[in-house]
């Protein structure tokens, strides 16, 4: 029996190590999310190892910068391991709360990490994937990048600090992205201030090689920026599609309630904007009404909160959301059974002020 347990432990530890590759290349620390078959989604062990690695490298005088990237070309990170969360919640375990708490602690720590932290956002960057990049000093997108906070589609709300980073997008772009969960590409990510640099994907290996060759005397944010520029990188967005709808987004998503936003979209008469309004309304109609409200409110509140206050608000809301929200049903309908027919708990007209205060007292 003891031998069997030992072998099982070895297999488990090997899997942990395989899921996350940690390397030192000269003065560069390199973290690779290594679950390409699962779009590099995060589990609790990976979160713990990333956090521990960063803490060690913070104290390591031979490490001058850190890069985090995903294995493969399809995804940087598709967020948290949804099926594991569903299993924990369904069975009355507490693993999901451990996951959320430690994930949020890691995300907040990244904002305060004292050395250059470089996130290569190549491929899909979804949900929790956004959490481990938005605090980076260099958020690098490529032509393959697809960014989204899709939580409202699965009966949840944008977390991992979204109340902070979405509320700081220009105008009300963050509210639009958080409520609808639409996917944006590289140019829109730059425009929305959710990325800092564009670099062609075929230059990424050269960028990593260049970073690995830097010496202690030449390492710094200025040198990293120069290297990106030399490889064809740029900070300015070129023809972002969001800019074409910016005035419309700001006028509609600055409204204080989901009901008012939906009504404004429904009443759109301008022929140039009517299709966009119809498409946006159609997206919202498929998502959890409570999630739409939660997304709009947390991003609204986040405008007036510090980073620490945003994370504190979100973790309190998570604990309540597990009890009253639509997360289990959303995961069932979209990911497990894939019938795409979630039965949400509430209609938007049922979510009166008094009902919301009873359901989500921490944000209403």
What function would you assign to each model-found segment?
Residues 110-154, 176-177, 181-182, 186, ...:
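Glycine-rich beta-to-alpha active-site loop
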